[in-house]
């Protein structure tokens, strides 16, 4: 049971790191707007949704198991990317201080 708890805790920390990376990617995207083509932002949000753990597990024919997630849900990934994009502020990407992911 202890080893399982450690794995669940490690997964939860990994989710926070991955969502922070999504947010930082959003900041990058907002700073290179002149280099992006029309539709790139929507494509990035769609990609974030497609690589959410819940989506990937469903695609594999399984019921999503949140305790096994290592990247966050589709909704979380898109929301944190958008948060970085809209704010442009690294301080808004602190997933470890966030009460809600």
Task: Label every PLM stretch briefly.
Residues 1-18:
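Post-HEXXH active-site segment of zinc metalloproteases
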Residues 4-8, 34-35, 39, 72:
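Surface-exposed, polar/charged faces of alpha-helical domains
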Residues 11, 15, 35, 68:
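Charge-dense, low-complexity intrinsically disordered segments
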Residues 16, 20-57:
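Short helix/loop segments within enzyme catalytic domains
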Residues 52-101:
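Pan-zinc metallopeptidase signature
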């Amino acid at each position: 049971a202890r080893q399982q708890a450690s794995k669940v805790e490690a997964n939860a920390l990994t989710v926070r790191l991955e969502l922070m990376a999504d947010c930082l990617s959003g900041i990058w995207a907002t700073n290179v707007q002149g280099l992006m083509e029309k539709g790139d932002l929507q494509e990035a949000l769609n990609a974030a949704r497609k690589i959410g753990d819940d989506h990937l597990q469903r695609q594999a024919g399984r019921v999503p198991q949140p305790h096994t997630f290592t990247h966050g849900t589709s909704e979380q990934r898109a929301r944190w990317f958008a948060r970085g994009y809209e704010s442009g502020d690294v301080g808004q990407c602190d997933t470890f201080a966030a009460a809600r992911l």
